[in-house]
Amino acid sequence: MPLRSTFTRFFQLEAASGLLLIAAAILALIINNSPLSWLYNGLLDTPVVAQIGALKIAKPLLLWINDGLMALFFLLIGLEVKREVLDGQLSKPSQIVLPGAAAIGGMLVPALIYWFLNRDNPAALDGWAIPTATDIAFALGVLALLGKRVPVSLKLFLMTLAIIDDLGAIVIIAIFYSGELSTLSLGLAAACIAALVAMNRLGVVKLGPYMIIGLILWVCVLKSGVHATLAGVTLAFCIPLRTKNAEPSPLLTLEHALHPWVAYGILPLFAFANAGLSLSGVTVESFTHHVPMGIAVGLLLGKTLGVFGLTWLAVKTGIAALPQGANWGQVLGVAILCGIGFTMSLFVGSLAFVPGASEYAGMDRMGILTGSVFAALIGYAVTAAASRKNTALPS
């Protein structure tokens, strides 16, 4: 499939998914602050057990969504990253520089702001990575509202930036949010990875064997202490993109099959399950607490400063150029939109502040929702204003 048609399909799916995410989050907030809140919380706490022989996995429904279904989301991210690295925007070093610099700035500055506001509280510092994330579906959904007033190059810049950001989130989760490790489970996971790599090298193109071993890998990683969603990324990196014969690409086949399910099912379900913040007892002072404040300011101000600042620096030093047809006002608007952390921030928050085990569980959602909403509204307004006269400013 040509790059442009692949990007167009990706953008349309992500944009529509972003709008659906908004609806799912609003619905969760309404239900959990209504007389039906008992039903909402009871449903998420429902125990679900999967057992095959002596192997038993028992978790509440919420964790099946966060550990199980989100592994498919990370599988999709892994497929997208591999495709982009081998045959897309990330395969061309000259096109990586600008979004790469922007992504690095967009992760470092929010983390520093959160650290500064919470530096005297070691327990709160566990949430430092929450404002480093960008919700690509939500951000592209807002950008899609501007239609053709925004150049395709700017949309591609945001998409590439967000993919690099997701890759950074994967590394952060693997290094900083793993529990106590099980040597046996890690050994079995390593054996699964070796089998996947061997199949790739031997030219196996049928998806069935990859998915079966991938499921076993997920169970091993789940039991190992490393977060289970990383099994999805590992599986994705082992699925071949190219084939020796004229057979369809296994990677593209799986990506195209999985994308609608993730965009229209898994992500909205995750948003519904995790965005239901109870507003009972919440006051203005609640939002000024150092944890939600650090997250909200990190997302809104940190992302803007980091993304725009590193983009400006890369262009001014001559190592990169502005996206074709875009102006600095539009770049500023996109930088603000990168502060929409939402699903990715909620996911990292669920690892940093485990519900029922951390006093800050729930506070993170206040900061995420506040920062993301303001980033969406302000980012849209700035991008719309800058797009009225869509001419590139001198760089």
From Swiss-Prot:
Keywords annotated in UniProt: Antiport, Cell inner membrane, Cell membrane, Ion transport, Membrane, Sodium, Sodium transport, Transmembrane, Transmembrane helix, Transport
Principal subcellular localisation of the protein: membrane
GO CC terms: plasma membrane
Q: Give an example GO biological process.
A: regulation of pH
TM region positions: 11-31, 61-81, 96-116, 127-147, 156-176, 179-199, 215-237, 262-282, 295-315, 334-354, 366-386
Give the reaction(s) catalysed: Na(+)(in) + 2 H(+)(out) = Na(+)(out) + 2 H(+)(in)
In its UniProt record, a GO molecular function of this protein is:
sodium:proton antiporter activity
| PANTHER family (alphabetical) | NA(+)_H(+) ANTIPORTER NHAA (PTHR30341:SF0), SODIUM ION/PROTON ANTIPORTER NHAA-RELATED (PTHR30341)
Q: Which NCBIfam families match?
A: NhaA (TIGR00773), PRK09560.1 (NF007111), PRK09561.1 (NF007112)
Q: Which family does it belong to?
A: Belongs to the NhaA Na(+)/H(+) (TC 2.A.33) antiporter family.
Q: What is this protein called?
A: Na(+)/H(+) antiporter NhaA
The organism of origin for this protein: Pseudomonas fluorescens (strain Pf0-1)
What lineage, starting at the top, does this entry show?
Bacteria, Pseudomonadati, Pseudomonadota, Gammaproteobacteria, Pseudomonadales
